[in-house]
């Protein structure tokens, strides 16, 4: 999709605050500082529209970005950040679970995993959760520019094995620095949302 218009419409913590215009939605999940904001910025061709932060755990709400009046990206709170209190982590979990299990507009989940490492228990739990609720998933291995391309296939194999990856889902190696994988991510989004466009 060729993106010219993007608007951060709202931050929500409850269904009563979600958008009501019935556009398809793609959720983005991952550990704190895995690169969700960087992925969003790359997809919409902006350098810093979605705020990137050196402070993990900064996203504490569901942030809805309307793209070209055709769909929403929904940035959900990052998980796995130890310095966030247990009570706050539970609150984040409830917000995420309520959205993923009850939102009719949701068309798929982009699950971001740090491509340099094996998936964490939280990464695996999120993937299993999505599969239980039959949510289509695109697994995006981030920060791949920090790994030599000759090792990408090995890392993909390690991640897929840890997740017990379902072949019906899609996997892509991504770099916000080089843009590697960007077109593949957009192709999956367009397919899930039944929209089309040039990148």
Swiss-Prot record:
Q: Which GO terms describe its biological process?
A: division septum assembly
The UniProt entry, under SUPFAM superfamilies, shows: P-loop containing nucleoside triphosphate hydrolases
Residues annotated as binding Mg(2+) are 37, 59
HAMAP family, per the entry? GTPase_EngB
User: What GO CC terms are in its UniProt record?
Assistant: cytosol
Full protein name: Probable GTP-binding protein EngB
Q: Which organism is it from?
A: Latilactobacillus sakei subsp. sakei (strain 23K) (Lactobacillus sakei subsp. sakei)
What GO molecular function annotation could you give as one example from this UniProt entry? metal ion binding
């Amino acid at each position: 999709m060729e993106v010219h218009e993007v608007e951060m419409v709202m931050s929500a913590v409850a269904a009563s605050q979600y958008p009501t215009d019935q556009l398809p939605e793609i959720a983005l999940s991952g550990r704190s500082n895995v690169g969700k904001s960087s992925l969003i910025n790359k997809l919409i061709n902006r350098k810093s529209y979605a705020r990137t932060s050196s402070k993990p755990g900064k996203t504490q709400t569901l942030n809805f970005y309307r793209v070209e009046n055709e769909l929403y990206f929904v940035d959900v709170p990052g998980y796995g950040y130890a310095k966030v209190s247990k009570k706050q982590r539970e609150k984040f979990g409830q917000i995420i679970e309520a959205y993923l299990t009850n939102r009719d507009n949701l068309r798929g989940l982009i699950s971001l995993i740090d491509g340099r490492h094996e998936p964490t228990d939280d990464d695996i739990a999120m993937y299993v959760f999505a599969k239980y609720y039959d949510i289509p998933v695109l697994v995006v291995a981030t920060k791949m520019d920090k790994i030599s391309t000759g090792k990408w296939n090995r890392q993909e194999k390690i991640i897929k094995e840890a997740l017990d990856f379902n072949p019906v889902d899609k996997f892509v190696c991504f770099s916000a620095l080089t843009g590697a994988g960007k077109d593949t991510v957009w192709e999956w989004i367009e397919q899930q949302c039944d929209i089309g466009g040039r990148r």
